[in-house]
Amino acid sequence: MATIKHLSSKNSNYAAAESYLTFQHNEYTGLPILDEKGRPKLRDSYLLDTLECSESSFAMACLIANRKYGKNGGREDVKTHHYIISFDPKDAVENGLTMERAQALGLQFCKDNFPGHPAIVCTHPDGHNSAGNIHVHIVIGSLRVRTVERQPFMDKPCDWEAGKKHRCTSAMLRHLRVAVMEMCEQADLNQINLLEAQGDHVSEREYWAQRHGQRRLDHANAKLAAEGQ
């Protein structure tokens, strides 16, 4: 079953998004893992592409857009939106899902649902706690850099006009869940009804708080297991 989760970030360091996706980080603290010389270690495997960035990096494309439209100058402004599509671990064995295929699906999903936004699309081969599920990260700059053709899921001019910001509303999340289900159906991948799913819209701070809480629970369970309880 594929799922989609959303995180928003107010971090003005746009380069941090690509750094997180390409370098190894502690899955609980979010801190980079360093080698013996104190340098960040690259991830063992990933695929990464950018969209709507021209010849610039993702970070530079976002900064240029902010300057052009006079947006995202405040500390409380949402700078990026991060969507994570996680596929069923069984898809790799049962349905031939590869990183390359997942990356292609993620790129098309981004083009279809976040047109006009600078974006990073990055596929990783494994999830938290070695879950074995291929997953795709889609990080978009919150500001749209060009006017796009209106799509059925866009209900206000700010959803397609240049210089406007992405809105992750309940209606948008519902649309994205349906889009994920349709994507998996067309690709012959395992899927469940995501319209019954809950809890897929959290802030970056809430996300890491949940991860830290899970770590404490894992330690407690390990201690009980060691004591034979």
Briefly describe each language-model feature range.
Residues 1-229:
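N-terminal nicking endonuclease/strand-transfer module with a His-rich metal-binding environment
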